[in-house]
From Swiss-Prot:
Organism of provenance: Klebsiella pneumoniae (strain 342)
Disulphide linkage map: none
Similarity remark: Belongs to the UPF0270 family.
InterPro entries on file: UPF0270, YehU-like_sf
Gene3D superfamilies (UniProt xref): YehU-like
Protein name: UPF0270 protein KPK_0377
HAMAP family in the cross-refs: UPF0270
Pfam families, per database record: UPF0270
Length: 72
């Protein structure tokens, strides 16, 4: 189930995004990017509708994923 990111408290949203970014451990190439920059990038993807917050009833967890991969 998609959770509208706009419905979350801003601090809660930031914490979810930060947790996601730290969990992903993505390599950003030759230059390391700050956590704040990575969080801002994910937030922009949510705002543009490229990414969505997804609640898993089975696992009782929230995840962020590309909208194109969501099969809900």
């Amino acid at each position: 189930m998609i959770i509208p990111w706009q419905d979350l408290d801003p601090e809660t949203l930031d914490n979810l995004i930060e947790s996601f970014v730290l969990r992903e451990g993505t390599d950003y190439g030759e230059h390391e990017r700050s956590l704040a920059d990575k969080v801002a990038d994910v937030k922009q993807q949510l705002k543009r509708g490229e990414a969505v917050l997804v609640w898993s009833e089975l696992h009782e967890t929230v995840n962020i994923m590309p909208r194109a991969l969501f099969n809900g």
